[in-house]
Amino acid sequence: MIAVETQFGCLGIEEEDGAITSLVWDGHTTGEKTPLLIEAGLQIRAYAEGRLQKFDLPLRVVGSEFQKQVCDLMSAIPFGYTRTYGDIAQDLGCPAQAVGQACGANPIPVIIPCHRVLAASGLGGFSGQGGVEGKVALLRHEGAASLLI
């Protein structure tokens, strides 16, 4: 794991077999700093500094096929834009609540931007540091805060 200090918290990034598998808050650097972890750290820092809008990293989502589909659709949401749980549910032909649960179980937040998925009636939840306030901070960083009004 490599840890990167940002205004959103200390983000810990893990890799396994050449792919990023996890991002956690309150991370600590442990083990070998592989070239992929170093690159992921550079990209997280560039994102936090406003110099990167789209991550270019190999990712591996460990989870059900449904979880992977939701993560793929979240990854397709551009920087500064949002979608609703209902939008994604409609794409997949499933209930919005199932999409919300999959968003909450996202193993690679920020890189897979679950913060860009909102409830139809407002923000919805956020499993990252700071809860909904953390989600708002990420959306403000991306210039999407006007969508919250």
Describe the function of each predicted region.
Residues 110-119:
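Short Lys/Arg-enriched helix C-cap and helix-to-coil transition segments
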Residues 74, 114-115, 138:
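Structural signal for hydrophobic
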